[in-house]
């Protein structure tokens, strides 16, 4: 369930839907939320939103005009990506999820966080969740000061190594590898691939460090 379909919410929904095959059952905006228990087609919703500037698409799900009820839907992961203090002591007891990912700034109040922690609901804090953008900005800064794009130095070297290996396999098996398949195999990572890989590695390492501290002090992730 995702609250907010702006720049953060829509792109997050797109990545979860296409890269991770996540089932997104509800998406909310300020005037209500779209719900489909079988999952919303996010690609179609993004096209609709771009054209109509709203998410009220009856072909993709049922629209409810009570935006505050979105947060009370039962789900595995709840992602507030719009409002500060979306979850407070006023509605925290109605939250029915296993994990909350704070994609907005401060969507869960301190008091609500303590209650959620007591109930065993994991809350990934905004200061961690939103760090990915800073990490990628750092990569861009490093690239700019070095005046060389990522992957340029080793790209051809890696391609030749893989091509030599394919040729060796062809010789031993006496079977010629399809040229189209060879092209796919030797295709090196582009800058976007490297940015994803680098940011994922940084976020994984950061999470493991946070997790170790959490276990040591026996508190919430916040």
PLM regions with names:
Residues 16-19, 92-94, 114-121:
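Short, surface-exposed basic-aromatic patches at helix termini and helix-loop junctions that form
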Residues 22-26, 76-77, 98-100, 121-122:
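Structural motif
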Residues 8-12, 86-89, 108-110, 132-133:
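Short glycine/serine/threonine-rich phosphate/pyrophosphate-binding segments
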Residues 1-72:
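Glycine-rich phosphate/diphosphate-binding loop of Rossmann-like nucleotide-binding domains
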Residues 65-75, 83-101:
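Rossmann-fold NAD(P) dinucleotide-binding segment
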Residues 98-222:
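Adenosine-phosphate binding glycine-rich loop
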Residues 55-59, 77-80, 100-102:
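Short, flexible loop segments at the rims of nucleotide/cofactor-binding pockets, characterized by
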Residues 3, 11, 28-30, 80-82, ...:
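Generic beta-strand/beta-sheet core signal
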């Amino acid at each position: 369930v995702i609250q907010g379909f702006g720049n953060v919410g829509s792109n997050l929904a797109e990545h979860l839907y296409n890269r991770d095959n996540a089932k997104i059952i509800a998406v909310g905006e300020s005037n209500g939320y779209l719900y489909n228990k079988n999952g919303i087609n996010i690609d179609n919703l993004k096209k609709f939103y771009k054209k109509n500037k709203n998410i009220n698409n009856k072909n993709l799900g049922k629209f409810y005009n009570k935006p505050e009820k979105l947060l009370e839907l039962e789900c595995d992961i709840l992602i507030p990506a719009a409002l500060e203090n979306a979850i407070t002591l006023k509605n925290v007891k109605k939250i029915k999820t296993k994990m909350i990912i704070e994609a907005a700034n401060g969507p869960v109040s301190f008091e609500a966080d303590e209650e959620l922690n007591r109930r065993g609901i994991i809350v990934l804090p905004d200061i961690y969740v939103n760090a990915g953008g800073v990490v990628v900005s750092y990569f861009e800064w490093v690239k700019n000061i070095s005046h060389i794009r990522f992957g340029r130095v080793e790209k051809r070297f890696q391609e030749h190594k893989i091509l030599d290996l394919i040729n060796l396999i062809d010789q031993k098996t006496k079977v010629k590898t399809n040229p189209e398949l060879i092209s796919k195999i030797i295709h090196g990572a582009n800058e976007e691939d490297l940015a994803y890989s680098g940011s994922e590695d940084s976020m994984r390492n950061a999470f493991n460090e946070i997790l170790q501290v959490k276990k040591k002090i026996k508190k919430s992730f916040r």
